[in-house]
Amino acid sequence: CSVVFANSLTGEVLISSETSSLDNEYFNIDLISARANYEPGSALKIFTIGSLIESDIVDENNSYLVEYEIEIIDGSCDDNYTGLKGCFRDFLKHEPLNLNVKEIIERSSNVGTIKIVNNSNIDDIEDFLKKFGFGSKTGVELSGESKGSFAEYNTCKTCLSSLSIGYSINTTQYQMVKGYSIIANGGKDIQLSLLRNLDQNLNQKRIISYDLSNRLKKLLINVVEGDNGTGKSLRMDGYVIGGKTGTSRTYLEGIGYSDKRFNTSFTGFIETNEGPIVGSVILWGAIGSPISEYVTGGSTAAPIFKNIVRNLVPDK
């Protein structure tokens, strides 16, 4: 498990903590928050959908018929299909639903997200992600920081779909904290730092408009406050919390994607008198949840995020 929390206005890192894995055969977590690449899963959806909101291609009220599964490659959802992966499904089976963009993010629907994004240009989405620092080092004072990577999208028929739901991209935990900080602080760039009493982030350049920042924050708050929100376990009286759960299959070197291990996360913000604090909790290779039969970001990482917030901001 690794945890990073930072002040989204100053960039000051408030918490950077890690615990060792019990299975060191596959996981070496020395400075994992800065070095380790992972596919963030649904925590990336706010950016991929946000790129279309910025371009006025969609807004929060656009509605879609959302089935349980969607085929990007013909026949790929058939039980006897053996070709390249081209079938995407929601986490739990459901009847077709009419959902708007706000509800799709609230429920973290993979199929809904793919339907929103699939008529867009993948290069435009990549450019939007790069504005937030994905694909570049954050510059935090930790040796060996990774810059992450993007897939070769022009060679991949399903990459637009997989990128929209947080696959086909490698990120670091610090990159996710930086990206969410830009959303939380009103849309300005941020330099994360382990140093105290920072003034380096004053007058930073604007990455997205204040209006877009506010709209994306409302969508993230609804993930916690909405009746069907995947982050509703984070609700606490007196706190304003927004964020996004993330669940992705763990990639094991030399083996491939695991069917039993998952990188589960919650990345989000808490409003405080000193500005929004942004945090990320990741469980690397999680195999179970203490509160649910399902291994998800909502059932593993979100409870840890909640306990940290209670101690970090106890005066709410």
Segments predicted by a language model, with ranges:
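Short, gly/Ser/Thr-rich active-site loops of penicillin-recognizing serine hydrolases
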Residues: 204, 296-316
